[in-house]
């Protein structure tokens, strides 16, 4: 059995209880060493075999899973954040399907949630934004033409940009090219959300590249953009005294 487990954004206590239990029971752990907090490996039993997938190819990862399965053991494939976002799990699951090896998925707290917590922010504010776009800048891995950053930026929605801080100048240019964001639109860069070395840089779209460079951030950071970082919004209807819900009547009813 293979368990795909989300490690959370960084802090060891942000892994789910199920994820922690699976780590404690695993015969083998293959973890994304470039991003997963190694403190989580302290949950492993002494005889557990541990592999750092940052040093491995897909084929090598699969070979380890097959060997453990053949021996009757269980493997935890430990991914950063939530595996469903930029986790490259589909190719692993397809290979396991082909081999007849059972697997399941345990979700984790994504780093985009960790970034919101670091900012003490809400991505979806009434009258400001009810949409969150999660994307990345094109680099060595291409993105579909219809998903170019400038095209997505045209919506002016809350945007969370993964895997792109090393291309910060291109990110800034694309955000402005979309037409909905202005140089004054609030933005932030969150480095290693929830880790002890977490750093939050608040800026605007116009100062995004310069602020990122000034703070020496070149990797392991999320870029967030949108008016949700500003001060304007309207009160939620859900808790308005005049609003009727299934559970209470509004004051004017």
Regions found by a protein language model. Name each.
Residues 84-155, 199-202:
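Class I SAM-dependent methyltransferase SAM-binding "motif I" and its flanking Rossmann-like core
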Residues 20, 42, 67, 124-125, ...:
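Short secondary-structure boundary/capping segments
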Residues 26-27, 95-102, 126, 208-217:
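Structural recognition of alpha->loop->beta junctions
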Residues 13-18, 37-38, 62-63, 120-121, ...:
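A generic local structural motif
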Residues 43-44, 63-64, 116-120, 136-137, ...:
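Short secondary-structure transition/capping segments
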Residues 1-109, 114:
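Class I S-adenosyl-L-methionine
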Residues 2, 60, 71-75, 131, ...:
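A contiguous loop/helix-start segment that scaffolds small-molecule binding in enzyme catalytic cores
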């Amino acid at each position: 059995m293979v368990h795909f487990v989300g490690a959370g954004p960084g802090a060891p206590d942000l892994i789910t209880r199920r994820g922690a239990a699976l780590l404690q029971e695993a015969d083998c752990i293959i973890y994304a060493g470039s991003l997963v907090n190694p403190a989580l490996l302290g949950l492993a039993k002494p005889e557990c075999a541990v592999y750092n997938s940052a040093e491995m190819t897909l084929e090598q990862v699969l070979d380890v899973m097959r060997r453990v399965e053949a021996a009757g053991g269980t493997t935890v494939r430990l991914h950063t954040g939530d595996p469903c976002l930029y986790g490259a799990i589909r190719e692993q699951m397809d290979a396991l399907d082909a081999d007849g090896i059972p697997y399941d998925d345990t979700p984790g707290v994504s780093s985009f949630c960790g970034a919101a917590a670091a900012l003490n922010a809400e991505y979806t504010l009434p009258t400001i934004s009810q949409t969150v776009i999660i994307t990345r800048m094109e680099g060595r891995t291409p993105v579909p033409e219809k998903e170019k950053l400038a095209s997505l930026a045209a919506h002016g929605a809350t945007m969370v940009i993964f895997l792109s801080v090393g291309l910060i100048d291109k990110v800034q240019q694309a955000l402005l090219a979309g037409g909905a964001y202005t140089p004054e639109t609030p933005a932030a860069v969150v480095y290693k959300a929830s880790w002890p070395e977490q750093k939050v840089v608040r800026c605007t779209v116009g100062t995004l590249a310069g602020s990122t460079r000034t703070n020496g951030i070149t990797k392991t950071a999320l870029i967030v953009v949108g008016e949700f970082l500003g001060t304007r919004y309207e009160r939620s209807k859900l808790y308005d005294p005049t609003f009727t819900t299934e559970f209470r009547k509004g004051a004017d009813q």
